[in-house]
């Protein structure tokens, strides 16, 4: 095992000098035993000097400290021993529940599966959330992005998806907390524990307080564990909250590594880094990885390079809108902005497809009429347009739904609505079967039956 010494420390980026014959390879993990710190090699500068990123805090490091080369990349344990445990980026347990029992470790840097290994699936995963099942259904083995600005409900919507799918789904789940609030990680752990599904979930956390090197790699650590389960012929759910923080960590590190920034100050390697992660989240002939990723949208701008780069990798995009959240409609999903490749008559069936498009058509017409209503009022509209507006407002309210994970805040018990009920209900509203009910009856209910019951009390 070759050793070197630290020659420069600039925040999270540390230069280490080795002898010329023993220069470490890119991505090799280096150990600073004295500071109990792991470094990852990013660049070879020449003359035996390598530039590395610290996986922990670089406080207290000084020049001349001895560094050992492990001659291998960072590796994490895979397999059943990781279930029910909270790990850090290095795969070390941080839940104070003793060491992890494992028989195999894997490097966090893996090549994506070969083309002939890939498998496509069109089997729809039922989420029980009306707006998602109707407008942007997602397939087993698909990739879903939850886009939204600050405070519109990404994490709550994701927690509800985890609650509804992970509990119904008999397979394993991996949750990677990338640069998010430690409190949310804590809440999630106890929620899984209370629902008795903790023994089917592996948790990998690199939260907001961690240095950028850690946040840049923690998504890969979580993904490696998910790949381990997939290669055991299992169907895995992979949850990443938040993919934007992964990009942001890359931006923080990039400038320190001496790269020229590109658009909006992002790293020039943004697309390559995103591709390296996303191409590995895929289903093979042995098993599937279905991923749900929360994507923070800076300043609500979907054209920002980070969310824009993420878009191209996804099968379904669920866009959360601040305008809808302001109306008090939760989940604040924008049914006109959200899309899915699975919304195809050959996949979801003719009835579902026609209903979803009819709902979007009514909402789009309402959006166009809003300006006229604001200037001239409802009275100036034709009878047909008045009917459209009336139905659109009912649809808008019926797209709201009480969540299981939000019961403690709202006092409303959560509702799981089957796909069959969802399609039938919206079809009936669009066809005018419930024109006689007041629009308040449709707000924050599960099935249409509940709306009918609620109307009797109004």
Curated annotation (Swiss-Prot):
Its main location: membrane. It catalyses: ATP + H2O + 4 H(+)(in) = ADP + phosphate + 5 H(+)(out). Gene3D superfamilies: 2.40.10.170, Bovine Mitochondrial F1-atpase, Atp Synthase Beta Chain, Chain D, domain 3 (1.10.1140.10), P-loop containing nucleotide triphosphate hydrolases (3.40.50.300). It is an enzyme of class 7 (translocase). It is a peripheral membrane protein. ATP binds at residues 148-155. PROSITE patterns: ATPASE_ALPHA_BETA. Belongs to the ATPase alpha/beta chains family. Produces ATP from ADP in the presence of a proton gradient across the membrane. The catalytic sites are hosted primarily by the beta subunits. This is ATP synthase subunit beta. The gene is atpD.
């Amino acid at each position: 095992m070759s050793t070197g010494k630290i020659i420069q420390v600039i925040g999270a980026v540390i230069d280490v000098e080795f002898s010329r014959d023993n220069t470490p390879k890119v991505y090799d993990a280096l150990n600073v035993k004295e500071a109990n710190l792991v470094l990852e090699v990013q660049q070879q500068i020449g003359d035996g000097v390598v530039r590395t990123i610290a996986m922990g805090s670089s406080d207290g490091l000084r020049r001349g400290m001895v560094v050992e080369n492990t001659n291998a990349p960072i590796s994490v344990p895979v397999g059943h021993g990781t279930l029910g445990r909270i790990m850090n980026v290095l795969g070390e347990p941080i839940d104070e529940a003793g060491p992890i029992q494992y028989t195999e470790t894997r490097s966090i840097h893996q090549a994506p599966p070969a083309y002939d290994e890939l498998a496509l699936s069109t089997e729809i995963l039922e989420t029980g959330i009306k707006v998602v099942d109707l407008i942007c259904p997602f397939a087993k083995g698909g990739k879903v992005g939850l886009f939204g600005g600050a405070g519109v409900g990404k994490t709550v919507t994701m927690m509800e998806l985890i609650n509804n799918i992970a509990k119904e789904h008999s397979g394993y789940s991996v949750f990677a907390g990338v640069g998010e609030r430690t409190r949310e990680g804590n809440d999630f752990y106890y929620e899984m524990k209370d629902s008795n599904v903790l023994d089917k979930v592996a948790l990998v956390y690199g939260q907001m307080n961690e240095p950028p090197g850690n946040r840049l790699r923690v998504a890969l650590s979580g993904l490696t564990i998910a790949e381990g389960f997939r290669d055991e012929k299992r169907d895995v759910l992979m949850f990443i909250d938040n993919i934007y923080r992964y990009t942001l960590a890359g931006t923080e590190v990039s400038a320190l590594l001496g790269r020229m920034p590109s658009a909006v100050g992002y790293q020039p390697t943004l697309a390559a880094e995103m591709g390296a992660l996303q191409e590995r989240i895929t289903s093979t002939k042995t098993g599937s990885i279905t991923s749900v990723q929360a994507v923070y949208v800076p300043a609500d701008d979907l054209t920002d390079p980070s969310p824009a780069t993420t878009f191209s990798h996804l099968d379904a995009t669920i866009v959360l809108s601040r305008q809808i959240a302001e109306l008090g409609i939760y989940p604040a999903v924008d049914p006109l902005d959200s899309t899915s490749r699975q919304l195809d008559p050959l996949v979801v069936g003719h009835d579902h497809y026609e209903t979803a498009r009819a709902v979007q058509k009514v909402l789009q017409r309402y959006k166009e009429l809003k300006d006229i209503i604001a200037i001239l009022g409802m009275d100036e509209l034709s009878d047909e347009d008045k009917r459209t507006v009336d139905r659109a407002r009912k649809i808008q309210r019926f797209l709201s739904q009480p969540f299981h994970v939000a019961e403690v805040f709202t006092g409303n018990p959560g509702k799981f609505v089957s796909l069959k009920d969802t399609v039938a209900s919206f079809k009936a509203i669009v066809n005018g079967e419930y024109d006689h009910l007041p629009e308040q009856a449709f707000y924050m209910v599960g099935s249409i039956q509940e709306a009918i019951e609620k109307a009797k009390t109004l």
